[in-house]
Amino acid sequence: MQLERAAFSDPFSFLGPQYQSQTTALRVWLPGATSVKVRLSGHVEYQLLSDPRHSGIFVLNESIDMTEVHYELIIDWSGTEQILDDPYQYHDISPTDAQVHTPKEMYNHLGAHLFNVVRDGKQIQGVRYLVFAPNASSASVIGDFNQWDGRRHIMQRIDNGLWALFIPEHAVGTKYKFELKGPNGESLPHKMDPYGAHNEQYPSFASVVYDQTSYQWNDAKWQQRPVTEKQKEALSFYELHAGSWKRNENGDFLTYRELAEQLIPYILDMGYTHIELMPVSEHPFYGSWGYQPIGLFSPTSRFGTPDDFKYFVDQCHQVGIGVVLDWVPAHFPSDSHGLANFDGTSLFNDPDPRRGWHNDWQSFIYNYDQPHVREFLVSNALYWFEHFHIDGLRVDAVASMLYLDYSRNDGEWIPNWEGGNHNHGAIALLKWMNEEVYSHYPNAMTIAEESTAFPGVSAPTFAGGLGFGFKWNMGWMHDSLNYIREDPIHRKYHHDTITFPLVYAFSENFILSLSHDEVVYGKGSILDKMPGDEWQKTANLRAYMGYMYGQPGKKLNFMGAEIAQSAEWDHDGQLQWFLTQFERHSGMQSLVRDLNKLYTTEPALYQKDCEPAGFEWRLQDEAEMSVLAHERLGDNGERILVVSNFTPAPREDFRLGMPVAGQYELILNSDAHFYGGSDYSVISEASTEKVESQGLAQSIVITLPPLSTVFYRLK
């Protein structure tokens, strides 16, 4: 029997009230029950008869009109009575087409949501379950409520490849999964809800019904702030892994609420404008750092509930800190409870491994050519802005999405219809996602981690671009780190390495990123990349940080760089906070704090981060002394001179030609004693002299401390 195998796609045609010409046949399926009664409209009871042919089926044949009548089942389980509301009396629960195909609506309907149905003039509360599994032959909702028995709550196949069931009395906290059978009736692993708002950890990986409307936000002032042009703002991001920034005294994770209590004051003190969280979407393997997500609609329950995460964002906003999330639409893991082989087919990925499998990451690649995949991912992007008030998404591994031959040899990939290597489906997805985000949330930002020279990543879609607000400048990161790791005596031979990023600095809206990618897999810490002894390492890092903050582009530091952490990042521990008791580490922390303050308060350092008009070389080709000098310009004539000396030799009486006459005052020196520097004597004010230098009619004379970056402001 199909019911016994939970292999039934149309349970409403057999179960619940079956209307005939003169009578109503009520049929229920309760395997294991001893007897069943039905109570109509709260008072009239009838005994159902057991079907002698099929154990577990109980039938009532009476000349009664059950149209719109609410009834309950009184079930005897071998001496234990249970009263249940029969889900098969509720037929009209289908969503509209727009609700399941409009990205901004989908997350409010697909999955498990609190739902009310009117029967007999009263509101019946429960949960409506909707799952997209077009190739499944049957689907059931399973959980503690039915002992995880897929025979008890078989779903109805409706339009659009959806399965639906309304279960009365289900509420927030109900644990559930979907039991699906493949196209040929084959059993599949139990599946987490792809739209689940809350999920349990190993071993159950169960989804949990959640009410996303219950949290009371207090960030109205932040949400209603005027829309601004982000390219003109000072943006300084602190990239963070929630599980390893800091642990409690027992070595356990901080909760989202504890993180709010401890992290937010730190961010305020350090002067960062935004927290960028590595992925918080639910992921089964902690060691993936979130980059192998399964529950895309659920903040990981390792650190608390969805409301706890909302509290974290809320608290950030109340003190003026923005929150950006890493988002992973490039691939998904092969864990059996996730999207892999979801309905017995490659529903979310291309079945051909040359397009659907990523060998490097041992994960599936989304099939962006499929409309339902694009809808799913765009809906997820909007969901985080709508329900969690986030301020931006940093999209991971964009290059792997754009190119069909990404990390593949000849013969390992399939060209597109033009014979080329561009993934047109992925390009369409990214454009659509960006258009939807900026349309609905004009104060938002989207950021691409894109490691190639794909054109127009941060250009608007109407101009042929992908539509991102910003792009990580990974070329700058690699080139500048390659330069700074050279021994100072050899840097003159690599001078072009440090100057080359300025050739393309304004081809995109760039963020200069010192990300987690540079402190993992044996790469050591940022400090460890610096040459020399302990003092020289720290001095090099101070000079490098100063150079970074003086360059055009927004700023991003991964946690730990600001205290000159000596060890490579360890996701199983916490940052080396004990190092801040030592002068060179506390000094570095003070320098980064002051650099953030300088960057966010001096318009010349941020207003034209993305415009060529905001940058002028003063000294580009001084390779022999490894000195670089440039000016940053603001909208109203503000000028700041930034000079870096990347050798341990001080440069006294150093003359620089200046285009504007006047007095230049020292506003930051990375070699100052309170940063742990040598405190080499410097000139605090330099006035231009009518002495030609570097082709300019006037010049100033300054002193450059060893391994330093200095900032001078035109008064």
From Swiss-Prot:
Its EC number is 2.4.1.18. GO terms for molecular function: 1,4-alpha-glucan branching enzyme activity; cation binding; hydrolase activity, hydrolyzing O-glycosyl compounds. It catalyses: Transfers a segment of a (1->4)-alpha-D-glucan chain to a primary hydroxy group in a similar glucan chain. One of its GO terms (cellular component) is cytosol. The keyword Transferase applies. InterPro entries: A-amylase/branching_C, Branching_enzy, GlgB, GlgB_N, GlgB_N_E_set_prok, Glyco_hydro_13_cat_dom, Glyco_hydro_13_N, Glyco_hydro_b. GO terms for biological process: glycogen biosynthetic process. The active site is at residues 396, 449. The keyword Glycoprotein does not apply. Keywords: Carbohydrate metabolism, Glycogen biosynthesis, Glycogen metabolism, Glycosyltransferase, Transferase. Pathway: Glycan biosynthesis; glycogen biosynthesis. Catalyzes the formation of the alpha-1,6-glucosidic linkages in glycogen by scission of a 1,4-alpha-linked oligosaccharide from growing alpha-1,4-glucan chains and the subsequent attachment of the oligosaccharide to the alpha-1,6 position. Monomer. Belongs to the glycosyl hydrolase 13 family. GlgB subfamily. This is 1,4-alpha-glucan branching enzyme GlgB.
